[in-house]
């Protein structure tokens, strides 16, 4: 793999994006009790929110693969950040349970349908078929490093 500046910067930006965009829907892993208390949610209600996100995400993997092959990658990377950011802003306003269902469903769309599939397609194009294992291994390692650093910031 030719490790030019453009490839390395593209790789780092995508890995950073992959690490951070999934922090919001999976925030429950770190702040489960405080979120339940702040939003006045029961364990069952929070479980339903997680299920909504997971089910929407499952369907969106198929749709995302189709979209990433047919539309401009720049837009498919920009829109999820803007959409997830707007959903995070809405989430920070202590919404009602019905609104939370909408937020988590929309996060399944913004994080998986438009971002994940496009990021994976671009990462795949950064190296030959013999380098895919190394690229995806470094991607997973980088996601862990960036997510860990973001936790402390």
Please name every model-derived segment.
Residues 82-96:
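C-terminal ends and interior cores of transmembrane alpha-helices
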Residues 87, 99-114:
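Hydrophobic core of transmembrane alpha-helices in multi-pass small-molecule transporters
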Residues 133-153:
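Glycine-rich segments within core transmembrane alpha-helices of 12-TM secondary carriers
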Residues 74-77:
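Primarily marks hydrophobic transmembrane alpha-helices of the MFS/SLC 12-helix fold
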Residues 113-128:
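Intracellular juxtamembrane helix-capping segments at the cytosolic ends
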Residues 27-40, 123:
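Membrane-interface helix caps of multi-pass secondary transporters
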Residues 3-31:
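Pair of pore-lining "gating" transmembrane helices in MFS-fold secondary transporters
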Residues 48-66:
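Central cavity-lining transmembrane alpha-helices of secondary-active solute carriers
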